[in-house]
């Protein structure tokens, strides 16, 4: 009987040991899988960091040309550069939170500054936009504002390498930006003097889509249907924007966009934002 008991105990321990080995193997597989996802997220974030660096580099180059046009009193050249240069900044806007105080210095609207009772501190592209498109003049104040803009653009460019960009910021930033496009930018409030809003919209969509493209391989492993839904909605938004392309590779004035199309665009961006907000599943 003692031998039988000993034999049964040995068998139980052997089975338990085998079970523990299987559990360890499963844990090991899960750990390796998690490590793989973390590595992919890190790689995608690094790639977006590089993309942001490139956009801010081009933004600085464009701003230098823009400021030179202001210094030369070249109104036509300044207006031609204005929307195109701003696109580099707008593509980076999903992570503008990381820009700190430089974001309002470069991109604040007068309405926002008035709301905060800081209109005397107003600076940046939109202040110069008002001078070019509403006041229709370049004076000493405009030139001073242009020099300050260039200084801020240089500071942002220098800061690019130290920006704290994370997957969470990228994902949340892209969703928040699309929400802003659909609810407030769609009214024309961003480019209230120049009506070059469609350039901004296109750049905002491109910035958000870059984030999706970089995370797409990870998302497809987690939820292929969600990934396909996001891609389909990006395509719909871009098709609506394409309707208002001009013959020079740019976009028509936002004033030419019908109320029907404005609503269609807002609805399309909202429809895109809904599945895009679920993309955080890749970090789980």
From Swiss-Prot:
A Pfam family the protein falls into: Peptidase_M75
Gene3D superfamilies hit by this protein: M75 peptidase, HXXE motif (1.20.1420.20)
Annotated signal peptide: 1-17
Database matches in InterPro entries: EfeM/EfeO_iron_uptake (IPR050894), Imelysin-like (IPR018976), Imelysin-like_EfeO/Algp7 (IPR034981), Imelysin_sf (IPR038352), Iron_uptake_EfeM/EfeO (IPR053377)
Keyword list, A-Z: Cell membrane, Lipoprotein, Membrane, Palmitate, Signal
UniProt keyword Zinc, yes or no: no
Annotated lipid attachment (N-palmitoyl cysteine): 18
Source organism, top-level taxon: Bacteria
Compartment(s): Cell membrane
Membrane-topology descriptor: Lipid-anchor
Gene Ontology cellular component terms for the protein in this record: plasma membrane
Lipidation, S-diacylglycerol cysteine type: 18
Entries under PANTHER family matching the protein: IRON UPTAKE SYSTEM COMPONENT EFEO
Family, similarity comment: Belongs to the EfeM/EfeO family.
Descriptive protein name: Efem/EfeO family lipoprotein
Lineage, uppermost ranks: Bacteria, Bacillati, Bacillota, Bacilli, Bacillales
């Amino acid at each position: 009987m003692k031998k039988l008991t000993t034999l049964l105990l040995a068998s139980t321990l052997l089975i338990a040991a085998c079970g523990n080995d299987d559990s360890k193997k499963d844990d090991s597989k899960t750990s390796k899988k998690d490590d793989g996802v973390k590595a992919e997220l890190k790689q995608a974030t690094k790639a977006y960091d590089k993309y942001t660096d490139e956009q801010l580099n081009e933004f600085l180059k464009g701003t230098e040309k823009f400021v030179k046009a202001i210094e030369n009193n070249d109104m036509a050249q300044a207006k031609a550069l204005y929307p195109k240069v701003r696109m580099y900044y707008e593509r980076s806007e999903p992570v503008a939170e990381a820009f700190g105080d430089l974001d309002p210095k470069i991109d604040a609207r007068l309405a926002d500054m008035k709301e905060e009772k800081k209109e005397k501190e107003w600076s940046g592209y939109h202040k110069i936009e008002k001078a070019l498109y509403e006041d229709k003049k370049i004076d000493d104040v405009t030139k001073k504002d242009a020099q300050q803009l260039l200084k801020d653009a240089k500071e942002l460019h220098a800061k690019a390498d130290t920006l704290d960009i994370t997957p969470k910021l990228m994902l949340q930033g892209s969703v928040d930006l699309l929400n802003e496009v659909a609810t407030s930018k769609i009214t024309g409030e961003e480019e209230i003097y120049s009506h070059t809003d469609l350039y901004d919209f296109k750049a905002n969509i491109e910035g958000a889509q870059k984030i999706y493209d970089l995370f797409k391989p990870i998302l497809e492993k987690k939820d292929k249907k969600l990934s396909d839904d996001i891609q389909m909605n990006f395509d719909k938004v871009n098709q609506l924007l394409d309707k208002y392309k001009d013959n020079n590779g740019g976009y028509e004035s936002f004033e030419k966009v019908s109320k029907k199309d404005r609503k269609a665009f807002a609805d399309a961006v909202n429809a895109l934002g809904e599945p895009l907000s679920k993309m955080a599943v890749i970090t789980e």
